[in-house]
């Protein structure tokens, strides 16, 4: 009997990996860090750093492209051959194992070819299927997790939220697709907002419509950098405190539920106090509980009060001009992508938007996106945005593991025999590349 495929969501910030039969993936940071004393820390060992100031990072991905396999191979070895840290998971050797992996959309052909060579020749996997995460998202008919579908029209919100059957979309097309013989949804607009950037990818019949793919150069890395500059200007110099600021971003930031101006009027109500680390009782700091304001803090405690920073930083998704970026926001990018699709499928795509990526863990992001997009659409169109109820960063791996159980996967994968027979150029051009679809 064939062994279950190994699924690797090779994100630029974090790798999610594990057998497709697992309910949840293992997680490992996709980076190498060096502290101010010159000590290097690989992947999850970064979490053991006590003095987090002046940490420098080196990542295998540059501008969203996997360019440094010398480092990525070390991180993969740490993930695949380290049973002591990952609950006994050990690949032992690649032979007899199959791989389902993600790669960045629009990966350069030479870089994609290099990845094939490493996977087949160094790790010796028996077969490979790789694709952008957006390609796996339509294969969610048997997805066991909970999805929350948000309507752009106010009168539909309660109905859609209360409908437990609307797991992935609510349009009539999607319901018909669920009853059809295919193992995927025919029309979906996938928004993948990750560490490096945000991709808008229309998927028709399980294949990305590359002519309409759009990229927004705002992601988790950008938000962390902008927050560092803002806090350094208003409070303390935090330009070398990447780990601390990233933690503040993940714990505190949110997207304005209605509009930036409404949140700005009530910014004092949303204000939070963040206690900076003293490296004795805390190494990352923490948000001060407003219910425990009477509890005395240590005498040397340093506190920063966060007011409009909480929602101004994520607002750059909708208004990049806030950070002096003269490019369209996420709503304009979606509209531009829709304009490049065949006119007949545009309402179907709008009614079947699926969000994935760690940035959608920001509270109110999906709701605000649905509301802002609905205002720009024709009145007879209804925008439906689906977002996972759990950790959005894990949704990519979960749909990949669902895809690994379908007949489509077994038909589309490339075996090691095919790779050695046809060569890496054939794999890139005819199976894993995007050139033939443009």
Swiss-Prot record:
* Designated name of the protein: Actin-like protein ARP6
Where does the UniProt annotation locate this protein?
Answer: Cytoplasm; Nucleus
Purpose = Component of the SWR1 complex which mediates the ATP-dependent exchange of histone H2A for the H2A variant HZT1 leading to transcriptional regulation of selected genes by chromatin remodeling. Involved in chromosome stability.
Reading the lineage from the top rank, the first entry is: Eukaryota
- Subunit structure, interactors included: Component of the SWR1 chromatin remodeling complex composed of at least ACT1, ARP4, RVB1, RVB2, ARP6, YAF9, VPS71, VPS72, SWC3, SWC4, SWC5, SWC7 and SWR1, and perhaps BDF1.
Q: What is its main location?
A: cytoplasm
List the SMART domains.
ACTIN (SM00268)
A GO cellular component term found in this entry reads: Swr1 complex
Q: Which CDD domains match?
A: ASKHA_NBD_Arp6
Any Gene Ontology biological process: regulation of DNA-templated transcription
Q: Name one Pfam family in it.
A: Actin
Q: Which GO terms describe its molecular function?
A: nucleosome binding
What segment(s) does the record annotate as region Disordered? 158-181
**Signal sequence bounds:** none
Q: Please verify whether the record's keywords include Nucleotide-binding.
A: no
Protein's UniProt keywords contain Cell inner membrane: no
Question: Miscellaneous notes for this chain?
Answer: Present with 238 molecules/cell in log phase SD medium.
Note the InterPro entries from the entry. Actin (IPR004000), ATPase_NBD (IPR043129)
Its family remark reads:
Belongs to the actin family. ARP6 subfamily.
* Gene name for this UniProt entry: ARP6
Q: Which UniProt keywords apply?
A: Activator, Chromatin regulator, Cytoplasm, Nucleus, Transcription, Transcription regulation
Low complexity: bias regions: 163-174
Q: Please give the Gene3D superfamilies that the UniProt record associates with this protein.
A: 3.30.420.40, Actin, Chain A, domain 4
């Amino acid at each position: 009997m064939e062994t279950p495929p190994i699924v690797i969501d090779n994100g630029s910030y974090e790798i999610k990996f594990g057998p497709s039969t697992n309910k949840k993936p293992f997680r490992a940071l996709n980076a190498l860090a060096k502290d101010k004393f010159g000590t290097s820390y690989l992947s999850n060992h970064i979490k053991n750093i006590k003095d987090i100031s002046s940490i420098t990072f080196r990542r295998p991905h540059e501008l969203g492209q996997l360019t440094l396999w010398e480092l990525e191979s070390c991180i993969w070895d740490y993930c695949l051959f380290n049973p002591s840290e990952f609950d006994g998971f050990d690949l032992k050797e690649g032979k007899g194992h199959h791989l389902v992996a993600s790669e960045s959309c629009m990966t350069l052909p030479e870089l994609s070819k290099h990845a094939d060579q490493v996977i087949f020749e160094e790790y010796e996997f028996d077969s490979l299927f790789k694709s952008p995460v957006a390609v796996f998202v339509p294969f969610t008919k048997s997805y066991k997790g909970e999805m929350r579908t948000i309507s752009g029209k106010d009168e539909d919100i309660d109905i859609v939220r209360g409908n437990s059957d609307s797991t992935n979309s609510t349009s009539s097309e999607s319901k018909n697709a669920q009853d059809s013989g295919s193992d995927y949804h025919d029309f979906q607009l996938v928004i993948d907002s990750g560490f490096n950037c945000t991709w808008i990818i229309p998927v028709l019949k399980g294949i990305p419509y590359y002519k309409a793919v759009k990229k927004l150069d705002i992601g988790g890395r950008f938000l962390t950098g902008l927050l560092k500059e803002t806090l350094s200007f208003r409070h303390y110099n935090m330009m070398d405190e990447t780990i601390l600021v990233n933690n503040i971003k993940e714990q505190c930031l949110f997207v304005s539920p209605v509009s930036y101006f409404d949140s700005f009027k009530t910014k004092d109500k949303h204000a939070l106090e963040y206690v900076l680390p003293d490296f004795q009782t805390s190494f990352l700091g923490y948000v001060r509980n407003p219910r425990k304001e009477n509890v005395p803090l240590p005498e040397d405690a340093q506190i920063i009060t966060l007011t409009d920073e909480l929602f101004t930083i994520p607002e750059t998704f909708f208004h990049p001009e806030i950070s002096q970026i003269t490019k369209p926001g996420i709503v304009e990018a979606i509209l531009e992508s829709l304009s490049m699709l065949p006119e007949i499928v545009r309402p179907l795509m709008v009614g079947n938007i699926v969000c994935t990526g760690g940035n959608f863990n920001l509270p109110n992001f999906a709701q605000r996106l649905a509301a802002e997009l609905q205002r720009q659409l024709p009145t007879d169109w209804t925008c439906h945005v689906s977002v996972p109820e759990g950790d959005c960063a894990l949704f990519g791996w979960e749909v990949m593991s669902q895809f690994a159980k379908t007949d489509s996967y077994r038909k589309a994968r490339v075996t090691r025999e095919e790779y050695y027979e046809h060569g890496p150029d054939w794999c890139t051009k005819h199976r894993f590349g995007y050139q033939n679809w443009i």
